[in-house]
């Protein structure tokens, strides 16, 4: 006869799984008082990428993939080359992460060639 799994054991297993996955989120957060982009993977665990961002002007945008301070725009913790932070905004609608500044349109951290930001 096969052993029965009690409801308590099942509940404890589900709770354990939920706790494991709830701690695996990535994104922008303060680590030791400085803004960083934190990722997690099974082989290494947490990886922290300090940004060197201006704390007083740092803002996480939209769904948390983009962020900016007064000098730089970031996508998943990497600076977007040539992006102008003062005019940088996310574009609404669609299922892709488009954004623009006064000079360019971006898809993730890539400049969309010949796209008009106006």
Task: Kindly give the residue locations of the regions a language model identified.
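Bacterial N-terminal signal peptides
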Residues: 11-20
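Bacterial N-terminal signal peptides that target proteins for export
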Residues: 1-12
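Non-catalytic tandem-repeat scaffold regions and their flanking low-complexity/translocation tails
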Residues: 24-118
């Amino acid at each position: 006869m096969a052993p029965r799994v009690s409801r308590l054991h099942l509940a404890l297993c589900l709770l354990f799984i939920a706790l494991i996955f709830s701690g695996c989120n990535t994104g922008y957060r303060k680590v030791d008082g400085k803004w960083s982009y934190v990722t997690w993977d099974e082989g290494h665990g947490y990886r922290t990428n300090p940004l060197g961002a201006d704390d007083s002007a740092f803002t996480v945008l939209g769904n948390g993939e983009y962020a900016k301070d007064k000098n730089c725009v970031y996508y998943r913790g990497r600076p977007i080359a040539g992006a102008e932070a003062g005019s940088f905004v996310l574009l609404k609608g669609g299922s892709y992460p488009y954004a623009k500044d006064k000079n360019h349109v971006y898809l993730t951290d890539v400049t969309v060639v010949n796209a008009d930001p106006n």
